[in-house]
Amino acid sequence: MMPEFEKNTVHIRDPERVEQIICGLIKGGASKLQIITDFDMTLSRFAVNGKRCPSCHNIIDNSKLVTDDCRKKLVHLKETYYPIEIDPHLTMEEKYPFMVEWYFKSHTLLVEQRLEKDKLPEAVRESDVSLKEGYEQFFDRLHQHSVPVFIFSAGLGDVLEEIIRQAGVYHPNVKVVSNFMDFDDNGVLKGFKGELIHVYNKHDGALRNTEYFKQLKDNGNIILLGDSLGDLTMADGVPNVENILKIGYLNDKVEELLEKYMDSYNIVLARDETLEVPNSILQKIL
């Protein structure tokens, strides 16, 4: 096993299986590999020095692009629905309608605010968003070896792209699928494009992107990164999986959810704000 796996944040149910998968990934090398990853709290940090970091949605919620009244409503929605999202006693099916409701209500509020497209870069710059330690190495190495990276996010695509653009890691090998804003000719938000992506319907989104995955039919080796049990379905659109390594970041309710995560993810990283483990695996493969 690798020294990075000795960290106390790392939890592995079946070390032999993990070793087997990693050997398969190493054997396939760069030409067979693709990355499928969530964004909020997976590539970005959950907290810095105990202070929560914003998601793509939170960046807008906390910015001066929305009125205080709107902010209060958005915070109220978060206080109502976030506990449902992470409730260990509810199934994904039970959570599903609540997530749709949350997104629909918050997106409606954002449209009412008539957000302006050209103000987004400033909102990102002024926010406390922070990518996980080791992000440059992660993105740059994948770019260097032309490994496709599919970022699949239930967040706000325009904000997400701006974050990775400002971080200097929006390389040509990166494709973002997310909730993209629809602006009118004056650059004012009028709605959202396409089907809603929320935490628990990524399976449907994955199937809508089969064209992308078909083009990568030789890339049967996958590293999947997520932070929610809903993220496990992100590779459902991949036609021919040979080896898949599922790495899960567990950020909240660690004690209650650890067993569940260990049943589903090959490697669980509890309260880990770094990309150390994925980077060490990529170093072996590439």
From Swiss-Prot:
SUPFAM superfamilies linked: HAD-like
The keyword ATP-binding is assigned to this record: no
Lineage: superkingdom: Eukaryota
Enzyme Commission (EC) number: 3.1.3.5
Catalytic function, reaction form: a ribonucleoside 5'-phosphate + H2O = a ribonucleoside + phosphate
Cellular-component GO terms for this entry: cytoplasm
Pfam families for the chain: UMPH-1
Gene3D superfamilies cross-referenced by the UniProt entry: HAD superfamily/HAD-like, Pyrimidine 5'-nucleotidase (UMPH-1), N-terminal domain
InterPro entries on file: HAD-like_sf, HAD_sf, Pyrimidine_nucleotidase_eu
Described function: Can act both as nucleotidase and as phosphotransferase.
Family: Belongs to the pyrimidine 5'-nucleotidase family.
Protein name: Cytosolic 5'-nucleotidase 3
Species whose genome carries this gene: Danio rerio (Zebrafish)
Name of the encoding gene: nt5c3
